[in-house]
């Protein structure tokens, strides 16, 4: 049987992973500035195998609205361009022979609202994950043997305190991204 400290440490670690997943999901959402992270989920079909774009090319941002993709092998230019076009990012790659340029258009108000809505959904998914972890931890606390009711109540209160801390981090992460999107 686990003790209170290990239950709390496990809950904290798992809630931390929920925050990492949220940050990863939010990094893909486009803001008004060029960010190589928006291409993170673009998968390139290259010589019969699929791999993330950052494994076949370097991605740089020379200015606030341009991404430059330089493949390590010129043979990857076509597949990279196709993968970007086929993604649901709404980007238009421009092949210059040895590099691909992507000029990011200004976000329309409607697109910004859609992005905020997506960010809100990711944040809600993270909140649900944190609450599920809390429920699991509280169940584990109640199963601990050889401790009194007071100790169980303290353990439950500590799990709730950890949960509140991580929910606040979810909210903070969401609001930061919302401000980025709305500019």
Swiss-Prot record:
Location of the protein in the cell: Cytoplasm
Keywords linked to the UniProt accession = Cytoplasm, Protein biosynthesis
Instruction: Provide the GO biological process annotations.
Output: translational termination
Q: Please verify whether the record's keywords include Zinc.
A: no
Q: In terms of one coarse class, where is the protein primarily found? A: cytoplasm
Question: Which top-level group of life is the source organism from?
Answer: Bacteria
Kindly state one GO CC term assigned in the UniProt record: cytoplasm
Database matches in Pfam families: RRF (PF01765)
Its Gene Ontology molecular function terms? ribosomal large subunit binding
Q: What does this protein do?
A: Responsible for the release of ribosomes from messenger RNA at the termination of protein biosynthesis. May increase the efficiency of translation by recycling ribosomes from one round of translation to another.
Which NCBIfam families does this one have?
A: frr (TIGR00496)
Q: Which family does it belong to?
A: Belongs to the RRF family.
Task: Tell me the protein's name.
Answer: Ribosome-recycling factor
Taxonomic source organism: Deinococcus deserti (strain DSM 17065 / CIP 109153 / LMG 22923 / VCD115)
The organism's taxonomy opens as: Bacteria, Thermotogati, Deinococcota, Deinococci, Deinococcales
